[in-house]
Amino acid sequence: MKVSALTGKHNYFEDFTVGEVLKHARGKTVEPLEQVWITNVTMNTAEGHFNEHLMKSSPWGKRLGFGGVTISMCIGLAAQDTAENALMELGLHKIRLKAPVHHGDTLYCYSEVLEKTDADQPDAGIVRFKHYGVNQDDKHVFEGERWVLIKRRSHWGDK
């Protein structure tokens, strides 16, 4: 497993190897404001996200985080290594929320390089990643695949 040193010059298309696993350097603690704000803005009316009184008697014992925030945070944590030289996000697939996330949890992300293919343009290639999110207890909370169009060093890198 390669441990990230945050951003650098080693995330062009040519630098990724199929089968490689990246442990991203940063973690992110989920703040209540982040969860509540986006739940309200998206008109998500599921009480599990905003009714603390109701959720105290639930199997989880407290409010649940909105899955969209979990997905965004995990992909954001991976972006330092997987999108620094991205030209375009091409798609997400097989998104799975594996366990609940609560306010105060801290998320970490790992990524695996699943596939590399040529793009229709000569200055970039397509990399398919599988991202994994875990919480502070190393519990698997998220996984999903992502396709990214990434610059080729041969066209964009230092000469």
Can you describe what each PLM-predicted range is?
Residues 46-48, 89, 94-95, 127, ...:
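Short, intrinsically disordered/low-complexity patches at protein termini
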Residues 28-30, 96, 113-117:
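Short, charged beta-turn/beta-strand-edge "cap" motif at the junction between a beta-strand
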Residues 85-90, 95-103:
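Mid-chain, well-packed structural core segment of small domains
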Residues 2-17, 101-106, 110-159:
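HotDog/MaoC-like acyl-thioester-processing domains
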Residues 1-91, 153-159:
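Hot-dog-fold acyl-thioester-processing enzymes
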